[in-house]
Protein backbone atom coordinates (compact mmCIF):
# COMPACT_ATOMS: atom_id res chain seq x y z
CA UNK A 1 0.00 0.00 0.00
CA UNK A 2 1.21 3.48 -0.88
CA UNK A 3 0.76 6.16 1.84
CA UNK A 4 -2.47 8.04 1.12
CA UNK A 5 -3.69 5.37 -1.28
CA UNK A 6 -7.35 4.38 -1.25
CA UNK A 7 -8.26 0.73 -1.67
CA UNK A 8 -11.90 0.64 -2.66
CA UNK A 9 -14.32 -2.24 -2.43
CA UNK A 10 -15.60 -3.65 -5.68
CA UNK A 11 -19.06 -3.87 -4.10
CA UNK A 12 -21.44 -0.92 -4.10
CA UNK A 13 -22.20 0.64 -0.75
CA UNK A 14 -25.70 1.74 0.19
CA UNK A 15 -26.06 4.27 3.00
CA UNK A 16 -28.83 4.62 5.56
CA UNK A 17 -30.17 1.09 5.06
CA UNK A 18 -32.94 0.29 7.53
CA UNK A 19 -33.33 3.84 8.83
CA UNK A 20 -36.68 5.60 8.96
CA UNK A 21 -37.03 7.94 5.98
CA UNK A 22 -39.54 10.49 4.74
CA UNK A 23 -40.06 13.05 2.00
CA UNK A 24 -41.22 16.61 2.72
CA UNK A 25 -41.84 19.84 0.79
CA UNK A 26 -39.86 22.95 1.77
CA UNK A 27 -39.68 26.53 0.47
CA UNK A 28 -37.18 29.34 1.00
CA UNK A 29 -39.34 32.31 2.01
CA UNK A 30 -36.33 34.52 2.69
CA UNK A 31 -34.49 37.01 0.51
CA UNK A 32 -31.13 35.18 0.52
CA UNK A 33 -29.94 31.75 -0.61
CA UNK A 34 -29.81 29.07 2.09
CA UNK A 35 -27.63 25.94 2.15
CA UNK A 36 -28.45 22.98 4.37
CA UNK A 37 -25.64 20.54 5.10
CA UNK A 38 -25.92 16.76 5.02
CA UNK A 39 -25.83 16.22 8.78
CA UNK A 40 -27.71 19.29 10.04
CA UNK A 41 -30.69 18.52 12.32
CA UNK A 42 -33.41 19.40 9.83
CA UNK A 43 -35.92 20.81 12.33
CA UNK A 44 -33.35 23.50 13.20
CA UNK A 45 -32.55 24.74 9.70
CA UNK A 46 -32.66 28.44 8.80
CA UNK A 47 -35.93 30.09 9.89
CA UNK A 48 -36.63 31.29 6.34
CA UNK A 49 -37.12 27.67 5.25
CA UNK A 50 -40.84 27.02 5.63
CA UNK A 51 -42.18 23.54 6.44
CA UNK A 52 -43.75 21.67 9.36
CA UNK A 53 -40.80 21.59 11.76
CA UNK A 54 -42.15 18.56 13.59
CA UNK A 55 -41.57 16.56 10.37
CA UNK A 56 -37.85 17.38 10.55
CA UNK A 57 -37.40 16.58 14.24
CA UNK A 58 -34.79 13.83 14.59
CA UNK A 59 -34.00 13.79 10.86
CA UNK A 60 -31.29 15.01 8.50
CA UNK A 61 -31.02 15.23 4.72
CA UNK A 62 -30.59 11.90 2.94
CA UNK A 63 -27.66 13.07 0.80
CA UNK A 64 -23.97 12.08 0.71
CA UNK A 65 -21.87 13.17 3.68
CA UNK A 66 -20.23 16.56 3.21
CA UNK A 67 -22.70 17.77 0.59
CA UNK A 68 -25.51 20.32 0.89
CA UNK A 69 -28.81 21.39 -0.64
CA UNK A 70 -29.04 25.02 -1.77
CA UNK A 71 -32.30 26.93 -2.06
CA UNK A 72 -32.44 30.31 -3.75
CA UNK A 73 -35.06 32.82 -2.52
CA UNK A 74 -38.52 31.54 -3.46
CA UNK A 75 -37.29 28.04 -4.35
CA UNK A 76 -39.60 25.17 -3.42
CA UNK A 77 -38.24 21.65 -3.31
CA UNK A 78 -39.01 18.13 -2.22
CA UNK A 79 -36.27 16.71 0.01
CA UNK A 80 -35.63 13.23 1.36
CA UNK A 81 -34.88 12.96 5.07
CA UNK A 82 -33.43 10.10 7.08
CA UNK A 83 -33.48 9.54 10.84
CA UNK A 84 -30.40 10.65 12.76
CA UNK A 85 -28.54 7.55 13.94
CA UNK A 86 -26.04 6.67 16.62
CA UNK A 87 -26.87 7.81 20.15
CA UNK A 88 -29.40 10.31 18.69
CA UNK A 89 -27.93 13.24 20.63
CA UNK A 90 -28.18 16.65 18.98
CA UNK A 91 -25.86 19.39 20.26
CA UNK A 92 -25.27 22.82 18.85
CA UNK A 93 -26.92 23.81 15.57
CA UNK A 94 -29.54 26.38 16.69
CA UNK A 95 -29.38 25.03 20.28
CA UNK A 96 -33.06 24.07 20.40
CA UNK A 97 -32.56 20.44 21.42
CA UNK A 98 -29.11 20.30 23.04
CA UNK A 99 -29.35 16.71 24.19
CA UNK A 100 -30.97 13.36 23.43
CA UNK A 101 -33.72 13.61 20.82
CA UNK A 102 -36.01 11.35 22.83
CA UNK A 103 -36.01 13.74 25.83
CA UNK A 104 -38.08 16.36 24.04
CA UNK A 105 -41.60 15.24 23.20
CA UNK A 106 -43.16 18.62 22.25
CA UNK A 107 -42.66 20.60 19.07
CA UNK A 108 -40.58 23.53 20.34
CA UNK A 109 -40.49 25.25 16.96
CA UNK A 110 -44.16 26.14 16.74
CA UNK A 111 -45.16 29.65 17.74
CA UNK A 112 -41.66 31.08 18.06
CA UNK A 113 -41.43 34.85 18.00
CA UNK A 114 -37.94 34.93 16.46
CA UNK A 115 -38.72 34.13 12.85
CA UNK A 116 -39.36 30.39 12.88
CA UNK A 117 -41.80 29.54 10.16
CA UNK A 118 -44.22 26.66 10.03
CA UNK A 119 -46.66 25.55 7.43
CA UNK A 120 -49.30 22.91 7.70
CA UNK A 121 -51.63 21.29 5.24
CA UNK A 122 -54.39 21.83 7.80
CA UNK A 123 -53.53 25.54 8.05
CA UNK A 124 -53.70 25.42 11.84
CA UNK A 125 -52.19 28.24 13.85
CA UNK A 126 -48.90 27.72 15.70
CA UNK A 127 -49.15 26.92 19.40
CA UNK A 128 -47.44 28.84 22.19
CA UNK A 129 -43.84 27.77 22.80
CA UNK A 130 -43.19 26.41 26.30
CA UNK A 131 -40.45 28.51 27.95
CA UNK A 132 -38.80 25.73 29.94
CA UNK A 133 -35.84 24.40 28.03
CA UNK A 134 -33.67 27.55 28.23
CA UNK A 135 -34.17 27.88 31.98
CA UNK A 136 -33.38 24.20 32.46
CA UNK A 137 -30.02 24.75 30.77
CA UNK A 138 -29.27 27.58 33.23
CA UNK A 139 -29.11 30.38 30.70
CA UNK A 140 -30.39 33.88 31.19
CA UNK A 141 -32.43 34.70 28.09
CA UNK A 142 -34.05 37.93 26.96
CA UNK A 143 -37.77 37.06 26.84
CA UNK A 144 -38.42 39.12 23.71
CA UNK A 145 -35.62 37.73 21.56
CA UNK A 146 -34.70 34.42 23.22
CA UNK A 147 -31.06 35.53 23.01
CA UNK A 148 -28.45 34.66 25.60
CA UNK A 149 -27.98 38.05 27.28
CA UNK A 150 -24.87 36.89 29.16
CA UNK A 151 -22.73 36.66 26.03
CA UNK A 152 -20.27 39.56 25.90
CA UNK A 153 -20.76 40.39 29.59
CA UNK A 154 -18.57 39.85 32.59
CA UNK A 155 -21.04 37.20 33.84
CA UNK A 156 -20.89 35.40 30.48
CA UNK A 157 -17.08 35.51 30.54
CA UNK A 158 -17.00 33.86 33.96
CA UNK A 159 -19.37 31.16 32.67
CA UNK A 160 -17.14 30.56 29.64
CA UNK A 161 -19.56 31.73 26.92
CA UNK A 162 -17.48 34.62 25.51
UniProtKB/Swiss-Prot annotation:
One of its GO terms (biological process) is urea catabolic process. Keywords: Cytoplasm, Hydrolase. NCBIfam families: PRK13203.1 (NF009682), urease_beta (TIGR00192). It is an enzyme of class 3 (hydrolase). Its EC number is 3.5.1.5. Pfam families: Urease_beta. Coiled coil: none annotated. GO terms for molecular function: urease activity. Pathway: Nitrogen metabolism; urea degradation; CO(2) and NH(3) from urea (urease route): step 1/1. It is found in: Cytoplasm. Residues 116-162 are annotated as: Disordered. The keyword Transmembrane does not apply. It catalyses: urea + 2 H2O + H(+) = hydrogencarbonate + 2 NH4(+). Residues 134-143 have a biased composition (Basic and acidic residues). This is Urease subunit beta. InterPro entries: Urease_beta-like, Urease_betasu_sf, Urease_subunit. Belongs to the urease beta subunit family. Induction: By urea and nitrogen starvation. Heterotrimer of UreA (gamma), UreB (beta) and UreC (alpha) subunits. Three heterotrimers associate to form the active enzyme. The keyword Hydrolase applies. GO terms for cellular component: urease complex. HAMAP family: Urease_beta. Its main location: cytoplasm.
Amino acid sequence: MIPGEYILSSESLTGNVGREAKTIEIINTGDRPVQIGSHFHFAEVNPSISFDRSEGYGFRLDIPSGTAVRLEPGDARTVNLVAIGGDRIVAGFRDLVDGPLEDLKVNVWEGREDGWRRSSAAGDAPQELPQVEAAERGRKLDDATDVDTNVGTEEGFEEGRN
